[in-house]
């Protein structure tokens, strides 16, 4: 199964970001806490190589808490400032401004020595589609100043947001990268909803996900859907279809409906706290 989605507006957005980065002190990179590495656009490291860096692991409420601690330690070891948060409920948001100031303290001190007072830190908010950038900005600013949606690619244009006297944010559209070298990365991005469902084979996606769950989170499927995990994957998904009344007009199990249900339950957190990858220590 090949995963790829790179519409033309992403090329244009990347060029604009390369231009805008000259105005920026800090790059705030949002990642999905369920796939902290796979949801990092590898182009961002090059884009922000001479800037202060902050990684926000969003949707931490949906992720495996132990894995989130491991990933936080992993990124800190790489030299990033890191915060785990849930932008929707504002959990973890209170510390953001203090951490932005801490990350940029050299710049603030440099300004002070040059007699420049109260110049706000200018931060660019970046991330792939559907990691929650707009929701984060709205929660941080306290008003709906960025468009939000649960479909990848809602934020299209450039917009500056003045948060307070200390911080200005530049929101950017979510961009992927032209080619996934590792298709496992594409699989994970598809599972969290960063690739449009319309171009995916949802049946095959569910097979790969169920295979992962049986290996890494045994018992979750049995607990949620009252099915036997001893069954092979196709039988298991068919059993979910029967138990959850995902049936065709003739009363047969509707495999595709059950596959979509399992993926939706993962995305919404109904399956439990799940992280799809671990840091290599």
Identify the residue ranges that each predicted region occupies.
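Structural beta-sheet core signal
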Residues: 29, 55-57, 125
């Amino acid at each position: 199964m090949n995963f790829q989605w790179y519409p033309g507006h992403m090329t244009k957005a990347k060029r604009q970001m390369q231009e805008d980065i000259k105005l920026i002190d800090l790059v705030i990179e949002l990642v999905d806490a369920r796939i902290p590495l796979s949801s990092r656009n590898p182009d961002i490291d090059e884009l922000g190589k001479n800037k202060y860096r902050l990684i926000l692991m969003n949707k931490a409420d949906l992720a495996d808490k132990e894995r989130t601690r491991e990933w936080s330690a992993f990124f800190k070891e790489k030299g990033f400032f890191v915060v785990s948060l849930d932008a929707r409920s504002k959990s973890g948001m209170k510390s953001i401004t203090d951490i932005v100031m801490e990350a940029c303290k050299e710049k603030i001190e440099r300004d002070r020595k040059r007699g420049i007072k109260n110049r706000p830190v200018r931060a660019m908010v970046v991330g792939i589609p559907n990691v929650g950038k707009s929701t984060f900005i709205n929660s941080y600013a306290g008003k709906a100043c960025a468009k939000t949606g649960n479909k990848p690619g809602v934020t299209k244009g450039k917009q500056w947001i003045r948060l307070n006297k200390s911080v200005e944010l530049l929101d950017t559209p979510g961009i992927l990268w032209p080619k996934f070298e590792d298709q496992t990365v594409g699989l994970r991005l598809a599972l969290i909803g960063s690739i449009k469902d319309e171009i995916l084979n949802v049946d095959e996606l569910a097979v790969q996900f169920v295979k992962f769950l049986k290996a890494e989170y045994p018992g979750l499927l049995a607990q949620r859907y009252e099915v036997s995990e001893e069954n092979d994957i196709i039988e298991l998904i068919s059993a979910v279809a029967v138990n959850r009344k995902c049936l065709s007009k003739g009363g047969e199990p509707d495999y595709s409906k059950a596959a979509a249900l399992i993926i939706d339950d993962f995305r919404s957190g109904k399956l439990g706290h799940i992280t799809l990858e671990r840091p290599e220590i």
